[in-house]
From Swiss-Prot:
GO molecular function, one term: proton-transporting ATP synthase activity, rotational mechanism
Pfam families named among the record's database cross-references: ATP-synt_ab, ATP-synt_ab_N, ATP-synt_VA_C
Top enzyme class: translocase
Keyword Thylakoid: yes
Taxon lineage: Eukaryota, Viridiplantae, Streptophyta, Embryophyta, Tracheophyta
UniProt entry tagged with the keyword 4Fe-4S: no
Stated name of the protein: ATP synthase subunit beta, chloroplastic
Length: 490
């Protein structure tokens, strides 16, 4: 049984006999600690700093060993604020990596990076803990089944379908709707999905974390009266936390998800918002640890850090983890090292476009930039594949014609091109959809559209049967029948 870095007196007294060090230097969230010769802690061991600050307030800071410096010194990164720490304070080596509670008792609760509950509902009722650092499953354990994960969102299901047990990235700059899309996916999938979900809030707004918690309580995904019946565990390390916490909170959430997959043999949904903040925190820590920065100031170990996290998010013969990750794109530049490194690990990418958002088309998913390894006729079937390709061709032709339209106007186009433009504009509007989680803002009730309905709708537009309808009829509706009904009222 691994020792968990909690602070009951009996444990601490046992630990004190074990291995004691002393703080020699503090630079922001990074501490240098000196130990007795031959008593050096291992890399990733958890250290606990205890004592009182100058005002007499009790201090209890957990750190993680990152470097062994020689001369019996180690460099560690703090998981909480280092206010009040002084040189010479005692540091206890727990002898093990950070361990967090796992299992059914975590459902319905909110945790911080250390696995401590932060929802004022008392301690977690579990004796099972698991270290946050572990290796990825071996090749032989991996599962290679291919099946589609229906989301009820037209643009996603048709053009960049998600794989069950796959990794999905939502890419977008600031304010184009990544978090709203993640909330909608939680709403559509987590409610209909029989298994459990784990949500990792990595370096995002505390307000959004609070909104999500309240929403989950209202929808019954978290059952307040009987916590054991809840379907989701929440792990938060938000924007105000030190970089150490933001760098490790993704691993805490993943460790909880892995337990449900490996031990309970369940299908798990893992939501991470936002994976870019994990990279950003790693970059802050890397500079403080004295590493030479790499491209655009990122850490030189960017690829390794991302790979270590992503390779653990996978499906085995026991169960699956389907992960949906929001990826912030700095300055809308998809070639930035952070989003570019993330791309390599994903089965499907949903790219959000500022251009579409400014047109008022929500979800602002770029139909030509979004990709999926699942969009193959042998997986999705001929009808789906053909429809998706024809939709993309129509939109691509419209994109090519936009310069001509801007200079010469629509009237200068050939009859065929004018028809293509009209259909493309209808398709563009029909790809929008009212969301359940945005009802309070838009006033229109949310819509879930099944895959068969989605394909039928786009086939009708492409066939020309709906050429007589005005394009406004296709804006923010669910299935195609709603569009024809709306046209009758226009």
């Amino acid at each position: 049984m691994r020792l968990t870095p909690t602070t009951s007196d009996t444990e601490v007294s046992g630990l004190e006999k074990k291995n004691l060090g002393r703080i020699t230097q503090i630079i922001g969230p990074v501490l240098d600690v000196v130990f007795s010769p031959g008593k050096m802690p291992n890399i990733y061991n958890a250290l606990i700093v205890q004592g009182r600050d100058t005002v007499g307030q009790e201090i209890n800071v957990t750190c993680e060993v990152q470097q062994l410096l020689g001369n019996n010194r180690v460099r560690a990164v703090a998981m909480s604020a280092t206010d009040g720490l002084k040189r010479g304070m005692d540091v206890i080596d727990t002898g093990a990596p950070l361990s967090v509670p796992v299992g059914g008792a975590t459902l319905g609760r909110i945790f911080n990076v250390l696995g401590e509950p932060i929802d004022n509902l008392g301690p977690v009722d579990t004796g099972t803990t698991s270290p946050i650092h572990r290796s990825a499953p071996a090749f032989i354990q991996l599962d290679t089944k291919l099946s589609i994960f229906e989301t009820g969102i037209k643009v996603v299901d048709l053009l960049a379908p998600y794989r069950r047990g796959g990794k999905i990235g939502l890419f977008g700059g600031a304010g184009v709707g990544k978090t709203v899309l993640i909330m909608e996916l939680i709403n559509n999938i987590a409610k209909a999905h029989g298994g459990v979900s784990v949500f990792g809030g990595v370096g995002e707004r505390t307000r959004e974390g609070n909104d999500l918690y309240m929403e989950m309580k209202e929808s019954g995904v978290i059952n307040e009266k009987n916590i054991a019946e809840s379907k989701v565990a929440l792990v938060y390390g938000q924007m105000n936390e030190p970089p150490g916490a933001r760098m490790r909170v993704g691993l805490t959430a993943l460790t909880m998800a892995e337990y449900f997959r490996d031990v309970n043999e369940q299908d798990v949904l893992l939501f991470i918002d936002n994976i870019f903040r994990f990279v950003q925190a790693g970059s802050e820590v890397s500079a403080l640890l004295g590493r030479m920065p790499s491209a655009v100031g990122y850490q030189p170990t960017l690829g390794t850090e991302m790979g270590t996290l992503q390779e653990r998010i996978t499906s085995t013969k026991e169960g699956s983890i389907t992960s949906i990750q929001a990826v912030y794109v700095p300055a809308d530049d998809l070639t930035d090292p952070a989003p570019a490194t993330t791309f390599a690990h994903l089965d499907a990418t949903t790219v959000l476009s500022r251009g579409l958002a400014s047109k008022g088309i929500y979800p602002a998913v770029d139909p030509l930039d979004s990709t999926s390894t699942m969009l193959q006729p042998r997986i999705v079937g001929e009808e789906h594949y053909e429809t998706a390709q024809r939709v993309k061709q129509t939109l691509q032709r419209y994109k090519e014609l936009q310069d001509i339209i801007a200079i010469l106007g629509l009237d200068e186009l050939s009859e065929e091109d004018r028809l293509t433009v009209a259909r493309a504009r209808k398709i563009e509007r029909f790809l929008s959809q009212p969301f359940f989680v945005a009802e309070v803002f838009t006033g229109s009730p949310g819509k879930y559209v099944g895959l068969a309905e989605t394909i039928r709708g786009f086939k009708l537009i492409l066939s020309g049967e709906l050429d007589s309808l005005p394009e406004q009829a296709f804006y923010l509706v669910g299935n195609i029948d709603e569009a024809t009904a709306k046209a009758a009222n226009l």
